[in-house]
């Protein structure tokens, strides 16, 4: 997608003029010794990451590193450096062009802390899963150390941590609004979203001698700059006015968000900034945004143009070693073990779930690979993965079943400002055909040496019910005992705040799934995921969800509690107490109940684990306070018994469920579990 006047060169159309073609490095170097073997006296670009270096397209630094290598640059990697001093950041010498800094595949605070702000003791992106190998606010710390190491080298931020902190944002862990990470890190540029186009442009122009401040015309770039003369400023306050559409102006337009200082003090202003940012997320019609930080203006260019299928193929066909760097020896990297036999077939998500960061980072436009590229990668997995058993562990992406889905009309797509293509109902302009995906599944199964192809990515069931043929194909060939899906709740109030379909859609999918399983002679189970303590959820909502779980004989072994990640719409609800999905105006905004106290958050978690005796005391207390003591007792329609087993009830959630009389549950290590009837 692009605007009618914008010319977007193909992703791989450039090559560094001064660079002679060279053979790709077996691995991007992590030491001077490796650089010496390659005959390098210096790196052009040094990438610093909070993850272990795995040379595989599921790891962002590998993609960016190999992409820049393909452009003729010498690229080195500094992985999980000791941040206590600048010395480890000098390990590869002074880069000629820039430092690229990322926290890794996850926001470092999400990686290091639970939803209850408790420190995690493991890290899936670290050798042997060891925790503590990256600092809090990893991107910020690494950037500051890079500046100490070499003051005059440009620093470019990227990755999901930088993307979701590109403007003033609420930080759950410090419980305050923080400045853009670009300001705190004192970096030169921030590239947000999937940044292949931007990083190529930035690298070539910096190498040609331009200064970072001159790169103000690149999509997906955030930087500090002055608003150019003759630019028309529209204030975010006016964008929800009844006549906003009639008052739209032509020419160079920028939208001025409430300032950093204003959103720190005014929660409604924060919600308004969030609303406008999400409205301006379509690459086809997004306008630049500007937000004052002290005496400077933070400028956000419109989002990057999505990659074409050919460009997606070129990214995933780069010469990855498809293994961790040899310096890790025999150490196990849990994230690598999880994905080494999986295949990404697409990017993006048009679901728009308010608690999710995928749309903010990857966008709503689905970017799909070709069948040929996907099949080629599967053959590489078969031929190059030690101990490969013939099972592809997952074929999907952010969701399992949006492959090649798109708006039926490119003009409508480029002008749309809706945050979701499927809420409150599936848009009539959306092509929901699963035919391409079904055909892909069948071709993958035909690859020699492939025994099973699993679908482990979350299935978007509101789309799946539109294609009985897809459900049949899925159940017949790609489910291994259970299938995880995410209704998230049963009650309309929280579901509307999440922008999720009603529970009736789940029931339709369940009926179709069970019918297909019966026809295929299989005994499969659905594993539903639910969220506790999401904004807009009342205690009564959680009680009704618990009753639904009991009626349907589900037990949750693990509980997912809402975690306010930076820049998500639900986080704006949590912080501001108003709904940015609606018009935000002082005194007229729709209020949203936010579950903030630890006591209430634990109560909501306890409702999801109603069957755990350790939770019964707090549930009895809550039910009495709610006037629902009638739900205390041993009848099937009651939620918790009146008696308390000895030795239980001391600390909610610290013990495994006690199995009572009746049918024994079928247990999985998942967030939801179906009981066998």
From Swiss-Prot:
Belongs to the UPF0313 family. Its cofactor is [4Fe-4S] cluster. It comes from Rhodopseudomonas palustris (strain ATCC BAA-98 / CGA009). SUPFAM superfamilies: Radical SAM enzymes. Gene3D superfamilies: tm_1862 like domain (3.80.30.20). [4Fe-4S] cluster binds at residues 349, 353, 356. PROSITE patterns: RADICAL_SAM. SMART domains: Elp3 (SM00729). Binds 1 [4Fe-4S] cluster. The cluster is coordinated with 3 cysteines and an exchangeable S-adenosyl-L-methionine. Residues 335-601 form the Radical SAM core domain. The keyword S-adenosyl-L-methionine applies. It holds the Pfam family Radical_SAM_N. Keywords: 4Fe-4S, Iron, Iron-sulfur, Metal-binding, S-adenosyl-L-methionine. HAMAP family: UPF0313. The keyword Iron-sulfur applies. Residues 635-677 are annotated as: Disordered. GO terms for molecular function: 4 iron, 4 sulfur cluster binding; catalytic activity; iron ion binding. Signal peptide: none annotated. This is UPF0313 protein RPA0679.
């Amino acid at each position: 997608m692009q605007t009618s006047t914008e010319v977007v060169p193909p992703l791989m159309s450039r090559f560094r003029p001064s660079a002679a073609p060279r053979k790709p490095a077996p691995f991007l170097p992590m030491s001077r010794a490796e650089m010496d073997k390659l005959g390098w006296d210096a790196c052009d670009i040094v990438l610093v990451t909070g993850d272990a270096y795995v040379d595989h397209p599921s790891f962002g630094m590998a993609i960016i590193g190999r992409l820049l290598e393909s452009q003729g640059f010498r690229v080195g990697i500094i992985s999980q450096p000791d941040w206590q001093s600048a010395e480890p950041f000098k390990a590869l010498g002074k880069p000629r062009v820039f430092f690229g800094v990322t926290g890794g595949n996850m926001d470092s605070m999400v990686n290091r802390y639970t939803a209850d702000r408790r420190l995690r003791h493991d890290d899936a992106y670290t050798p042997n899963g060891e925790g503590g190998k990256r600092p809090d606010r990893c991107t910020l710390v690494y950037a500051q150390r890079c500046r100490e190491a070499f003051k005059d080298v440009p620093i470019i931020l990227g990755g999901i941590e930088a993307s979701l902190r590109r403007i003033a944002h609420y930080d759950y862990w410090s419980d305050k609004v923080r400045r853009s990470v670009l300001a705190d890190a004192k970096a030169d540029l921030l590239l947000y979203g999937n940044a292949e186009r931007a990083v190529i442009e930035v690298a070539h122009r910096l190498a040609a001698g331009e200064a970072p401040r001159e790169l103000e015309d690149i999509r997906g770039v955030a930087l500090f700059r002055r608003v150019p003369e003759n630019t028309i400023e529209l204030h975010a306050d006016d964008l929800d006015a009844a006549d906003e559409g009639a008052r739209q102006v032509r020419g160079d337009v920028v939208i001025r968000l409430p300032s950093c200082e204003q959103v720190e003090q005014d929660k409604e202003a924060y919600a308004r900034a969030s609303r406008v940012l999400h409205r301006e997320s379509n690459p086809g019609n997004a306008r630049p945004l500007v937000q004052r930080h002290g005496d400077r203006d933070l400028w956000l260019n419109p989002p990057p143009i999505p990659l074409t299928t050919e460009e997606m193929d070129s990214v995933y066909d780069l010469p990855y070693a498809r293994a961790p760097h040899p310096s890790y020896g025999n150490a196990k990297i849990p994230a690598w073990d999880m994905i080494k036999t999986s295949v990404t077939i697409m990017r993006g998500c048009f679901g728009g779930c308010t608690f999710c960061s995928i749309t903010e980072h990857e966008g709503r436009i689905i970017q799909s690979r070709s069948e040929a590229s996907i099949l080629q990668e599967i053959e590489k997995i078969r031929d190059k993965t030690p101990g490969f058993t013939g099972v592809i562990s997952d074929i999907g992406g952010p969701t399992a079943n949006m492959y090649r889905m798109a708006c039926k009309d490119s003009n409508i797509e480029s002008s749309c400002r809706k945050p979701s293509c499927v809420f409150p109902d599936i848009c009539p302009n959306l092509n929901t055909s699963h035919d391409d995906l079904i055909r892909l599944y069948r071709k993958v199964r035909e690859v020699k040496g492939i025994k099973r192809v699993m679908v482990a990515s979350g299935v978007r069931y509101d789309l799946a019910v539109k294609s009985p043929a897809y459900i049949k194909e899925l159940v017949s060939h790609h489910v291994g005992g259970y299938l995880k899906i995410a209704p998230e709740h049963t009650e309309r109030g929280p579901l509307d705040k999440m922008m999720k379909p009603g529970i009736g859609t789940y029931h339709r999918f369940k009926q179709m799934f069970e019918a297909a399983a019966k026809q295929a002679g299989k005994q499969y189970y659905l594993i539903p995921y639910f969220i506790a303590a999401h904004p807009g959820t009342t205690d009564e909502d959680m009680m009704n969800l618990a009753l639904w779980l009991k009626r349907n004989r589900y037990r949750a072994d693990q509980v997912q509690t809402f975690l306010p990640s930076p820049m998500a719409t639900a986080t704006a609800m949590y912080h501001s107490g108003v709904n940015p999905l609606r018009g935000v105006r002082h005194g007229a905004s729709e209020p949203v109940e936010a579950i903030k106290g630890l006591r209430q958050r634990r109560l909501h978690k306890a409702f999801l684990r109603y069957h755990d005796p350790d939770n019964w005391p707090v549930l009895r207390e809550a039910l009495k306070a709610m006037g629902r003591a009638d739900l205390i007792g041993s009848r099937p329609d009651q939620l918790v018994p009146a008696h308390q087993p000895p030795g239980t009830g001391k600390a909610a959630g610290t013990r495994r469920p006690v199995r009572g009389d009746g049918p024994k549950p079928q247990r999985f290590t998942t967030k939801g579990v179906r009981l066998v009837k």
